[in-house]
From Swiss-Prot:
Catalysed reaction, written as an equation: dTDP-4-amino-4,6-dideoxy-alpha-D-glucose + acetyl-CoA = dTDP-4-acetamido-4,6-dideoxy-alpha-D-glucose + CoA + H(+)
Disulfide partners: none
Name under which the protein is recorded: dTDP-4-amino-4,6-dideoxy-D-glucose acyltransferase
Uppermost EC category: transferase
Biological source species: Escherichia coli
PANTHER family: ACETYLTRANSFERASE, CHLORAMPHENICOL ACETYLTRANSFERASE
Pathway(s): Bacterial outer membrane biogenesis; lipopolysaccharide biosynthesis
Alphabetical keyword list: Acyltransferase, Lipopolysaccharide biosynthesis, Transferase
Alphabetized CDD domains for the sequence: LbH_MAT_like (cd04647)
Function: Catalyzes the conversion of dTDP-4-amino-4,6-dideoxy-D-glucose (dTDP-D-Qui4N) to dTDP-4-acetamido-4,6-dideoxy-D-glucose (dTDP-D-Qui4NAc).
Family to which the UniProt record says this protein belongs: Belongs to the transferase hexapeptide repeat family.
UniProt keyword annotation of Transferase present: yes
EC number, UniProt record: 2.3.1.209
């Protein structure tokens, strides 16, 4: 995997970019002026980011794996230490499928009914492969989403959630908070 260098990152026109950021040269970005990227972030091949006016805020120590996408007009926040596994789709906008409206981004807006909302992904959240997160969702700190789940409602802190729609099935250990307290002071000068 080839990564964009510092000059290329600057030329992209992001709202902000931190240190030690590795973005594949095969990832695609739209609305870069609405995208903020923190420190120690890695974005893999074939990811697609399309930020509307709400923007996309990616905090520190984030990995977004191959073929994932973040798309929509609403605000998307990904908090520290979150992990987005491969083929995850996060939508801050969604169309209605009732048939009462047309759908498709090339149809004028007066004929469509697009809903946009915020998506907040808390610290230490992990989203499993192939999952979908819809608008107006909060994944509270430490929530885990199993592979191939569809998240359309909030997930409580330190719960494991699976299914279509995603529902909690168990609690998740908080041991990672102890590890964070040891890791954080030693993390200066990290290399992903």
């Amino acid at each position: 995997m080839a990564y964009l260098d510092e000059i290329q990152l600057k030329e992209m026109g992001f709202k902000s970019v931190g240190e030690n950021v590795k973005i594949s040269d095969k990832a695609s970005f739209y609305g870069c002026d609405n995208i903020s990227i923190g420190n120690n972030v890695r974005i893999d091949d074939f990811c697609v980011f399309s930020a509307g006016e709400g923007g996309i805020d990616i905090h520190d120590y984030i990995h977004i794996a191959v073929y994932s996408s973040i798309i929509g007009k609403g605000k998307v926040t990904i908090s520290d230490y979150a992990n987005i596994s491969s083929r995850v789709s996060i939508y801050s906008s969604n169309e209605y499928y009732s048939g009462n409206y047309m759908s498709n981004p090339v149809v004028p807006s007066e004929y469509t009914n697009i809903h946009s909302g915020t998506v907040f992904i808390g610290k230490h959240v992990i989203i499993g492969c192939g999952s979908i997160v819809l608008p107006d969702v909060i994944l509270h700190e430490g929530a885990a989403i199993g592979a191939l789940s569809v998240v359309k409602e909030d997930c409580e802190a330190f719960t494991v959630n699976v299914g279509i729609p995603a529902k909690p099935i168990s609690e998740r250990s908080k041991k990672l908070l102890e590890l964070e307290s040891v890791f954080k002071p030693s993390a200066i000068g990290d290399n992903l």
